[in-house]
Amino acid sequence: MSSKTNQKSGGKTSLSPPKFVKKHSRGGHGPVIVQILPRLVRGGVERGTIEMAEAIIAAGGKAVVISGGGILEHQLTRCGAIHHRIPVYEKNPLKWGLIRRQVRAVLRQENADIVHVRSRAPAWIALPAAKSLGLITVSTVHARFHTKSFLKRIYNGKMLKTDHVIAISEYVKSLITRSYFGVEERLSVIHRGVDVKAFDANDVTQPRIIRLVERIDLPEDVPLVMLPARPTSWKGHEILLEALAGIKHLPFLCVFLGAAEGRASFTDRIVQKGVELGLEGRFRLTEAVEDMPAAMMVADVVVMPSITPEPFGRVALEAQAMGRPVIAFDHGGAAESIVHEKTGWLAKPNDADDLGRCIAAALEMSDNKRRLMRKASRNHIEQSFSTAKMCSETIRVYARLLAKKAAAER
């Protein structure tokens, strides 16, 4: 598989945090960057928005977020960003006019320079308002684009009607350029990043580990295979059980972290499948946990067996940052973040037997090989997939667009 042989970890790079040039923004002050997303709930898009708000402020800009609100509002405002609660999650076009006027009023009030949309409904609502004010527009495409129907193609395509488009992986970029023309020259890939300070094995204390173990009642003497994922079929819970059924001779307990929060039809199907495969007592469904670094810390192997390609997949990054062996199928964004047999394994897509072989290899690693992989994984993430790198590259996109506009207005 090409992704197994072509991956390179590269040399260590030193990223100096970029700063905005004040003269490139309107009024000679630090630029005002307005990010717009549906809600501030727990998720990768939302975390990335807060991380970017922090980076904008650190670069000398003003960070503003428009969303429908959510449990992360306090975390956002605590970093110094300004939040405006507007229902930009609304998908009913009949309501967009009123919401658009609200957004336009905020953009004028905040004296915005750049509008950065992170989802489709907000793009339909906010981009016309931004363009009517002559503002720079940016979008980040976080998800797969489904373009089979004509209407869906038009709906998704709104995300590409900006001055610059950011794709979170080469995989997402390929989906965009395969379906839409005239985008590539204003399209760049900025991989999602992981907070290497939060996901640092050296900083996870023993009390945190004990609390985690007690909360989900984990044994101490059995290797743990962990799948942290939403209770959704495409995340690969069933194919992981099939893979584990082929290596029953090895000691392990599989923990489906977050799966217990699914509907009864989902959890019943997983339990029934496991019992049918002879894995009764060898797997456990638990609720999601807040302390993911501690959860990763107790895992011996982290698996991300998504049967549909992930646009990117933060779980793989977080596991590698924690120095944990990670296994995923060799497709989608996972193929870009995992270096096969150096920081983890890439199994043949949707092949339960090959997935099982990879898990067995991880479980049977010698202490020395595990130590080498732990170091390589951590270095790989620090060099190529840190939050600091993601934010720096995005700030540079903003700065280029501001400079280009300033030059055009001279």
PLM feature segments, named:
Residues F20, G28-P31, Q35-L94, G262:
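N-terminal strand-loop element at the rim of the active site
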Residues G43-E54, P223-G246, D268, D353:
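A conserved mid-protein helix/loop that constitutes part of the nucleotide-sugar donor-binding site
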Residues G60-K62, R215-L224, H237, L241-R284, ...:
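A conserved nucleotide-sugar
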Residues V65, P325-A328, I338:
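Short hydrophobic beta-strand element within catalytic cores of glycosyltransferases
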Residues V117-A123, V141:
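Short His-centered aromatic/hydrophobic patch
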Residues T137-I168, S174, F181-G182:
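A conserved, positively charged/aromatic
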Residues P223, D354, A361, N368-S384, ...:
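A short, well-ordered alpha-helix in the C-terminal region of glycosyltransferases
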Residues H340-E341, W345-D353, A361-D367:
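Conserved acidic donor-binding segment of nucleotide-sugar-dependent glycosyltransferases
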